[in-house]
Every structure is written in C-alpha cells, then in structure tokens.
Amino acid sequence: MVLIRVLANLLLLQLSYAQKSSELVIGGDECNINEHPFLAFVTSDRRRCAGTLINQEWVLTAAHCNGKYMKIELGVHDKMVRNEDKQTRVPKQKFFCLSSKEYTMWDKDIMLIRLNTPVNNSTHIAPVSLASRPPVVGSVCRIMGWGTISSPKVILPDVPHCANIEIIKYSKCQGVHPELPAKGRVVCAGIWQGGKDSCHGDSGAPLICNGQLQGLLSWGGDPCAQPLQPGLYTDIFDYSDWIQSIIAGNTTATCPP
C-alpha cells in the first residue's frame, strides 16, 4: 500500500524514541556531523520533518509538512546535545499550495520558507545549491534525516542517518505506482532490490546528488525499504524558476505553477 509518509507523524506521542543505534535510516548509517550543514530539523504541532537551507534566509521542505507553530532548527546533529552554533528560526513567510487539493503526491509537494531572521554561516550551518540539471538515471545520491530507523515499527533516533540510493527510471516507478501521471515532477530514487530508504519522519528531507539539492522526500511505500518500492522526491530542478523568482521578489505566487 502506498501512502504519504507523514501520516505516521500524527502518532508521535505513541512512538518509541531511540538513542544512537546500530540499526540505522533504513539501511543507512549515522551521518558524519560535518556532512549536513544545510540540513534542518523542522517541527510543528502536527509532525516532524526535515528541510534544506538554500541560502541564509530560505529553507525548502515538503508542502505536507505545514502546520502551526513551525520551528526550524539548523546546526543540529544529536538532538540531545546542543551545538554551540545551533540556530532556531520560525517562518516569516511560507510559499506553498494552501489547499491539499492543489498539490498531490506527485506534484507541487514543496514549500519555500522565509526565515524570520537570516542565519549565520558556521561550521555546522551552510546552504546547499539547487540542482543545475535534471536528475540522471543511475546517479548515486545521498538521503538523510531524523526519520525512523525501523519499519513498520517506528523508532525515531536522536541523530540523523544517511544512506546512498540511486536515481531510478521514472517509467519503472510508473509500473509500480500506476497512479503516477505520464510526466510527474518527481524524482524516483531508492534501491530497486530494497533495503535502503527514507521513511516516516523524513518528509521534506533532501536528496543530494553531486553536491546539489535534487529532491525533497514526498512519499513512498509502507513499510519502507521494500523491494520494488522506491521513494518519490519532489524534483527541485522543475521548480527552480519558481524558487528563484520568489527569492528575488519577482513573484508572489504562493502556489507554484
């Protein structure tokens, strides 16, 4: 069964939390503390997600991560240990499709957040550049986040975990997910044989290819990391003009075209 992974976040009060574990994002390892200066921990009254710092004032995450009392934490690794350069912000503006009827699991699941004050770059805080070209099938890319390290049982870690996955041909994903349109603005990525995957709590997390932000986790199979069930990531390259126009102040279009 396919579903939006954010649904599991609604049960956070019932979940078991874990300290550092040897079992990791599904099939991954604890991220090196210095490899994710752009990674943001995004929370609200409804769920926990991840996001990506793209310049000192703007963060990208998934539209379905929206909620009240949103908080964006940067410079975070172990959530139980405060880094000296950790910085916390709240949204000043949010640009996304306001109604869930305007975005789907394969289109417009993206939110651009303007922070209330810019962050200062530091050892553990620095932006990543947007994808400069479409995803290349077969490319090995990096996923990361504080999502569950086990599925279907949900165990949320204190530290982010990372894994390498591959860009998979879109038509292969259509074969598994027939509801996908002929051309969706998503990147299909994972391990076709299963074993490595992002999962519940990773929504909005970055897909990093060649050092650039190629995608944001949108949805996938449940349980996670199953064979023939790669994840679907919002394709950043397809939204780069909208993102750049908002940042430059050339448009106020809340919902991307």
Swiss-Prot record:
Its EC number is 3.4.21.-. Its main location: secreted. GO terms for biological process: proteolysis. Expressed by the venom gland. InterPro entries: Peptidase_S1_PA, Peptidase_S1_PA_chymotrypsin, Peptidase_S1A, Trypsin_dom, TRYPSIN_HIS. Residues 1-18 form the signal peptide. Keywords: Disulfide bond, Glycoprotein, Hemostasis impairing toxin, Hydrolase, Protease, Secreted, Serine protease, Signal, Toxin, Zymogen. Gene3D superfamilies: Trypsin-like serine proteases (2.40.10.10). Residues 19-24 form a propeptide. The active site is at 64 (charge relay system), 109 (charge relay system), 203 (charge relay system). Residues 25-248 form the Peptidase S1 domain. Pfam families: Trypsin. One of its GO terms (cellular component) is extracellular region. One of its GO terms (molecular function) is serine-type endopeptidase activity. Glycans are attached at residues 120-121, 250. It is found in: Secreted. Snake venom serine protease that may act in the hemostasis system of the prey. Belongs to the peptidase S1 family. Snake venom subfamily. PANTHER family: KALLIKREIN-1, KALLIKREIN-RELATED. This is Snake venom serine protease nikobin. It comes from Vipera nikolskii.
